[in-house]
């Protein structure tokens, strides 16, 4: 029997570690509390649900390939030029388009050490090298990022706020990064968690896009209840938006996602409610965990990062196992280089009370 020939991918592809999302099921457990994927705690706006039901009869129609109505709604909401907005199937797709359009073999991208994993995955996918700049106290270090830049660097990705650490830089530091880069390097400010930031010295990136060359802002609808519909958007200079429109697919966003996005933007009160809920329970959870002796830093996202002991009975793996026994799934972040941490999404009131109760029992040594 002739041995099957296995086609080989391009060099570097097999070096990619596949992205593993937050789990949603546990064997033998019926009631799951999923706090592993940073989804919106309150779900989607009622207007979104109504709009999806109303649009169900149009599922056989191709969507508007230019997302015209959604871009116009985004422009009205944020005071931006719709012509300089491009929408994608989540901001993930837009990260991939930027890498595909501007990087390739022999090139490099720069990101902070604990930045979003997809930057490196997409870079390797096009043959570019991801360079990780060291962080300071789990926070992007602008000096380290600038020092990591090479002649080959085409893109610099900054998640602000960052996932999974929750740390956030003031606008002045982001400006310092942009001004320290060569003009031909594209700075991508990934503001996926912008809705949850509560500080006066923060801008999601739109002003930087307008005031400095070759800067792109990424945003998403995933954190305000539309994660399952995969919808994100970017704002940038006209020449970069033109390039992204040339490399994206013709119908890259489904019609239901477009309708849902417009409905979400039309209900700012629900976004405000989601933000208030997140703020209350994020700080409540942080205080409760700190009182138990668990280290939890400040977070500007819809999650907290809990740090456990490196060894002994109170490790992150042991805490995770204890939570899973109660049907609670949080996010292990060893893949980010943080093996002693768990990322805990802010969920509903009862869910946060359950995770705090379970961790309290764990830290008290119950069940051991």
Swiss-Prot record:
N6-(pyridoxal phosphate)lysine, modified sites: 223
Catalytic activity from the UniProt record: L-histidinol phosphate + 2-oxoglutarate = 3-(imidazol-4-yl)-2-oxopropyl phosphate + L-glutamate
Protein name, per record: Histidinol-phosphate aminotransferase
Keyword Transferase belongs to the record: yes
Gene giving rise to this polypeptide: hisC
Annotated Pfam families: Aminotran_1_2
Entry EC no(s): 2.6.1.9
Superkingdom classification of source: Bacteria
NCBIfam families hit by this protein: hisC
